[in-house]
Amino acid sequence: MTTLAVLSVASELFPLIKTGGLADVAGALPAALRANDVAVTSLLPGYPAVLGGIEDPQQVHSFNELFGGTARLLAARCGDLDLFVLDAPHLYVRPGNPYVGPDGKDWPDNGLRFAALAQVGAALGQGLLPHYKPDVLHAHDWQTGLLPAYLKYSGRPGPKTVFTIHNLAFQGRFPYELLGRLGLPERAFGLDGIEYYGGIGYLKAGLQLADRITTVSPTYAAEIQGSEAGMGLDGLLRLRADRLSGILNGIDTDVWNPASDALISATYDVESIAARARNKKVLQARFGLKPEPGALLYGVISRLSWQKGLDLLLEALPQLIGGGAQLALLGSGDAELEQGYAAAARKYPGQVGAVIGYDEALAHQIQAGADALLVPSRFEPCGLTQLCALRYGAVPVVARVGGLADTVVDANEMATATGVATGVQFAPVTTDALIKAFGKTRALFADVVAWRNLQINGMTTDVSWKNPAQHYAKLYRDLVAER
C-alpha cells in the first residue's frame, strides 16, 4: 500500500504544549496512523515551550514578513513525531498559555496569530518546500479554520482538506475589519466563505470550505446538527451532513498504562486490581481525605466550567457527602467555581479535597486511586478522562451526551445481565439526575462482584488509537481517490 503524506496543523500538541484534549489527539494520532501507512508531519506554533522541547531543529524556510514580523519555519522532531514549527517570536513568544495572557484575557491579536499558522499550513500544501508535498491537510479546531480558505482563494491547486471539530463552543470570531490584514481577497467575505454574522468566523470557514469535516464522536456529530448543540452552526452542518462524520478519539495507551505508569504510587493490571487500594490510600492523603478504604472515592479531573457541569456537582455535594462518599477534584477555570470548590473543601474537611490548577502526575494518581470518575458534562464532544478511567479501573459516572454516551456502557439491567457494562450514565443533565446517579453508583459499589466486573470490563475495553486511526486512514484515502 502506498504511504500517504498528511500534514496535521494544530495549535497545541502533547508533550510539547497542552491546554486540553486537542493536544493529546494531535500528539497521539500520528503514531497510530503510521501503522496504517500514513506518514504525518505536524505543524504547530513556536511557543517558548515548543522551541525548548524540540530536537534537532533545522531552518527550512524564512519569511521576511508574516503578519508584522519575520519568521522561520523549522523542521524538527519530538520523540517519534516529525514536526514543522513556525518560529515567529512576535506572534508566539509571550507569557501565559497559547490563547490568553497572564490576566486571563484572550490575546488581542489572536486572529493574526492563528491566521499565520493556517496560512503557512496552506503554503506547505501548495509546495512551499520543494521536497515536501502532502496528500492531505488535516486542520484542527478554530485556530486552523482559515487553512482551507487560504487554499481556495489562492487560485492555485492544493491537496484535499479535513477539518476536525474538537469543540464547537470555541468558534474564533473576529471583526470584519481584520479582513484587510489576513491576505485574503474581499470575495472571501461571503456566506459561502469566511463571513459569519457580519464578522469573520474561523471555525465557520473550516466547516464551510474543508473537503471533509470530522468531529470526535458519532453522537456529537449528530448532536451538533441540532439547534441546542449546534451553537449557531447547525444549519451549515446539516447542509454539509454528507461530508461530516464522527470518529471517536483514543488515548495513548503507553502513556496511560497502569501496569507501567511511573506517575502512580503502585502499578497494577487487570489481574491485580486489588493493588489500586494503595493508590487510593495515597490519594486520600494527598487531598486531606479520611483514610477510609471502604469510602466510595469519586475523582474529578476537569476544566471548571458550565460546559463540564461542575456547577451541578457543587449543588449536589451535600447528597454525595451524605451518602458517605468522598471527592478528590483537580481542575481550574471559572473563578466562581474555583472559589466554590475551595470553600467546599473547607466546609467538608476529610470528605472533599480540591486542588485548583492542573498537575499531570496528580491526574494519573486520581485515575489510579479513585473508585469512580465523575464527568457530568452538559455537552462533551468526546472526552478523554473517561477513556483513561476505563483503562485504570476507575468506574466512569457520566452524563449521557456526546462521546460519553458512545464510550461508557451504562450498568442498566440488560448490560449488567449480559456482562458488558462499564460504568454509569445519567440523563438529563440536571442536579436531580446526578444525585440519582450517586445512589446507583453507591449500590453498585456495595456489590463487590458487580463493581469488580465493571472494572474488569473497563480495563479490557480497547481505548487505544488503533480503531480511530483506521477510520482516519480510510477517510484520507477516500479523499485522495476523489481527485
From Swiss-Prot:
UniProt entry tagged with the keyword Glycosyltransferase: yes
Enzyme Commission number(s): 2.4.1.21
InterPro entries: Glyco_trans_1, GS/SS, Starch_synth_cat_dom
HAMAP family the UniProt entry points to: Glycogen_synth
Family statement drawn from the similarity comment of this UniProt entry: Belongs to the glycosyltransferase 1 family. Bacterial/plant glycogen synthase subfamily.
Described function: Synthesizes alpha-1,4-glucan chains using ADP-glucose.
UniProt protein name: Glycogen synthase
